[in-house]
Swiss-Prot record:
GO cellular component entries: large ribosomal subunit
Protein name: Large ribosomal subunit protein uL1
Function: Binds directly to 23S rRNA. The L1 stalk is quite mobile in the ribosome, and is involved in E site tRNA release. Protein L1 is also a translational repressor protein, it controls the translation of the L11 operon by binding to its mRNA.
UniProt cross-references to Pfam families, sorted A to Z: Ribosomal_L1
Signal peptide, first to last residue: none
Family: Belongs to the universal ribosomal protein uL1 family.
Length: 220
C-alpha cells in the first residue's frame, strides 16, 4: 500500500475526491479500496473471500472463458463469452498455445473433472472455476451476464487486507461511491463467525499510482 495522505481521516466522498485529484499519471488509473481486517489470516476459518457485482461496472470489458462441451459451447458463444472450448482448448492451455487473457473462467459441473487437469495453471491466476462463485454451473448464460455486468472477486491477503477495484479516475464520484459501498457490504457479509468484535480496522481508497487516503471506519 502507498504512503498515507497525512494522518487525516476523510469521509468516503471526500476521500474519493482526494484520490482523483492526486491521480497524475498519463494513463487512466484504477481506483481501489483496501480494507484492513481484524483477522488472523493464518487461520483458515478467518480467511475472507467472496465476489460482488459492482453496480456501476469496472469501466472496461470483463473477459470470460468457458470450458464445456456439446450444447453448452453454443450457449456460451451466444452469451458473448470471449473464449470458448472443450478438451481441445484444455490441451491448448496445457501446451501454452492459448493465452487465457480473461478475468473469469467458467465450466459446467459435468466438465469440472476435465478442467481440474489444468488447476495448477488456472489456480495461481485466480481463474479456477469455483461453485462458491457460481462459476461451475449449467446456467452459463445467466452466469456470464452477471459476470460481464461487473462482477469482481476479493480475498484477504496474508496481512489481512482485502483489495478490490471499484472503477477508475474517470468515474463520477457518485459511481465510485456506489461501487465502494457494494464492496464494503459484500466484505461485511463475509465476516468470519469467530470475529466477535471489531472487524474493519482501517479503510483506504487509492489510485494506481497515487497515495492512499484513509476514510471513515465503516464497522457499523
Amino acid at each position: 500500500m502507498s504512503s498515507l495522505v497525512s494522518n487525516e481521516v476523510y469521509d468516503v466522498e471526500s476521500g474519493l475526491r482526494k484520490v482523483i485529484e492526486s491521480a497524475k499519471a498519463n494513463f487512466c488509473e484504477s481506483v481501489d479500496v483496501a480494507i484492513n481486517l481484524n483477522i488472523n489470516s493464518s487461520k483458515s476459518d478467518e480467511q475472507v473471500r467472496g465476489c460482488v457485482v459492482l453496480p456501476k461496472g469496472l469501466g472496461r470489458e470483463v473477459r470470460v472463458a468457458v470450458f464445456a462441451k456439446g450444447g453448452h459451447l453454443e450457449m456460451a458463444r451466444e452469451a458473448m463469452a470471449n473464449i470458448v472450448g472443450d478438451e481441445e482448448l484444455i490441451e491448448e492451455v496445457k501446451k501454452k498455445q492459448c493465452k487465457l487473457d480473461v478475468d473469469w473462467c467458467l465450466t459446467t459441473p459435468d466438465f469440472m473433472a476435465s478442467v481440474s487437469s489444468i488447476a495448477k495453471i488456472l489456480g495461481p491466476k485466480g481463474l479456477m472455476p469455483n461453485p462458491k462463485f457460481n462459476t461451475v454451473t449449467f446456467e452459463l448464460a445467466k452466469a456470464i451476464k452477471i459476470i460481464k455486468s461487473g462482477q469482481i472477486r476479493f480475498k484477504s491477503d496474508k496481512t489481512g487486507i482485502v483489495h478490490a477495484k471499484i472503477g477508475n479516475v474517470k468515474f463520477s464520484i457518485e459511481d465510485l461511491l456506489e461501487n465502494f459501498n457494494a464492496v464494503i457490504n459484500a466484505v461485511k457479509q463475509c465476516k468470519p463467525a469467530s470475529i466477535k468484535g471489531l472487524y474493519f480496522k482501517d479503510v483506504f481508497v487509492i489510485s494506481t499510482m497515487g497515495k492512499s487516503v484513509k476514510v471513515e471506519n465503516l464497522n457499523n
